[in-house]
Each structure stands twice: as C-alpha cells, then as structure tokens.
Amino acid sequence: MEISGFMKHPWIGRRVLKTGLAVCLTTAICMAFNLSPTFAVISAIVTTEPTAADSLKKGLIRLPAAALGAFFAVLSAYFFGQTPITYAIVSMITIAVCARLRLDAGTLVATLTAVAMIPSTTDHLFADYVSRVAGTSLGIMISTFVNFMILPPKFGPILMNKVEKMFAMLSSELKLVTTKVVDFEKEETMTSYRTLHHHLSETYKLTTFQHDEWKYRKSSSSEKRSFTYLHRKLDYVYKALAHLGKIGQIRLKKPLSVKERQLVLSFLVSLTNILQDPLHQIHTEHYALARQLEDAMHKKKDATEPIHRLLSELISLHDLTVELEQCTADERRFSLEERAYPSYIFLERLRPSD
C-alpha cells in the first residue's frame, strides 16, 4: 500500500500514527532507564494535540500539573492508604488546585497520573514520587516532540474539503427553507440551519489551527494567500446564513402568484448551481432573473410585507454571490500566474476526470 493512500485511510490518520509512535518511543525509553512505562504511556496518549502550537503551549502547563497530581497521590496514600476515600480526595484536590492555578489544560493528565499512582504507592514515598513524575514528564515531552517534529498537520486540503461541503450544505438548505416558505409549509426549518452554524464554527477552528502552526513553521506567501481566500469563502457562508435565517422566519400572508412562484424557484435553482460551482460563475440568465426579482420587489410598496422581505433577502444573497464570483475569479487568476500556489484550491478540483 502506498504511503499517500495509507495516510488517507478513513480510520487511521496522522494523529493516530503520532500517538502510536509517541507511545512506542516512550515505552522504549522507560524500559531503558528502568522506569514504569504505565504513567508515561498514559501521558503520551492523552497529550497528543492537533497542532504543534497546542502541544508546546499545553505541555508547559501539563508538566507542573502532573507533578501536583503525583504529590497529592503520594500524600493521600500515606495518610489514608488505598481506600475509596483516597481516590475521591486525590481526584477532587487535583481538579480543584489545577483550576485554582489555571492549569486547566493539565487537569486530565494530572488526575489520571494521581489516580493511577495510588495502587502502586509503597513505603518509599519520595522514590515513588520521583519515579512517577519522571515517567509522566517523559510521556508529555515525547508526545510534544513527536507532535512537533513528525507528520506536521496539513490543514489546507482538509479546510478546502470542508469549505466545499459547507457550500453544498448551504445551497441545499437555502433551497429547502425558501421552498417551504413559498409553499406555506409550517414544518420546523431551523434545525438544519443550526447544524450548519455548528459546522461553520468547527470549520473556522481549522483556520485558527493553521495560524497557530505558522508561529512555529515557515510557509509560503501563496499558502497564506490561499488560506485568506478560504477564510473569505467562509465569511460568505456566514453572511449567507444570516439571510437564510431571516428567510426561515418569514410567513407569507397569501400565496405567491404563479408567475412570482416560478420566478423565485427559478432563481433558487440558478443560485444553488452557482454556490456548488467551484468557480461560482454567474451566467447572463441569472442576472436576468435577479433583475426580475428586483422589479417584482419594487412593485411591492409596503417594505414590511412578507413577500417584499423574501424578495429583498434573495436579492441580498445575489449581491453576495456577485462578490464571491469576483473574489474567486481574482484568486483563480493569481493561482494560474503563481506556480507555488496550492493545487488543492483550484487545479485538483477543475481537472477533468479520466
């Protein structure tokens, strides 16, 4: 199996491979220095992060947190022995102190370390403490090192795929919600709208992850520009969702005329096709439909009338789409002139299938 194909396997990704490598290295080093690998392995597993930035930042928090957890475990085991109350006290104190000292990122590893230490505590308290802290610290450091140096995350293709899915979901939801409004259907239309908002928030997080990565890794100006473009596309989805939400709240007082209904539905089909097109190209027929919508809206004198509001929101979506087309055309032109521009943005999606 080729490495590239293996990396794309749906259930084994970079983070899983890095976790396995961190566990293997941690165990080997622990055995070489006659340290118990249990605590080190637990730490290595729970401290693998999606970005190198997170690994470094949280690693500095987890080290003192783990030391605190081990200290509380040794102390509690000495006074109370291995009893249920000991586990409860250690867990509560560790969580409370980590929260008090703002070591939230280290709470999990500190609590796991503390609880796992209790059964193996002996009369040699100091030796136990040093051994467990050494193992836990080793696991955290190895995990951080592997996360930073091995298989750095590639958020570009992931973000591009998610942006494409967002546009497909947006076009589908837009057609569904508007059609229900036009056809006087009173079913709940906002559930999938909220799901869209959730997916959008999760996709925005990927851009944050990439910006964090750039603090520690070099990147080309073309790569940064492509991320700016993808971020602008997400901003378009965000604005479009605002209009979609308003459309979903509209309740028509009377049915549209046959002509108006046909116009709205034709415009919807055209708009959704544009949203799903990788280049978001707008054809002459769509501009003609948009002008007809504007004419129909201007004939409605009362701006508070539901039909006026519906047409106004659709026209606003059209205006946004015009901006999107121009933005995409400019970026496409730049990608053709710049060889270093990432191919996953346009080239791989516009390449004809075999």
UniProtKB/Swiss-Prot annotation:
GO CC terms: plasma membrane
Family: Belongs to the UPF0421 family.
Annotated InterPro entries: ArAE_1
Primary localisation category: membrane
Presence of the UniProt keyword Transmembrane in the record: yes
Subcellular location: Cell membrane
Protein name (Swiss-Prot/TrEMBL): UPF0421 protein BH2644
Membrane spanning residue stretches: 22-42, 60-80, 107-127, 133-153
Record's keyword annotation contains Acyltransferase: no
Superkingdom in the source lineage: Bacteria
Bilayer disposition of the protein: Multi-pass membrane protein
One Pfam short name: ArAE_1
Keywords for this protein: Cell membrane, Membrane, Transmembrane, Transmembrane helix
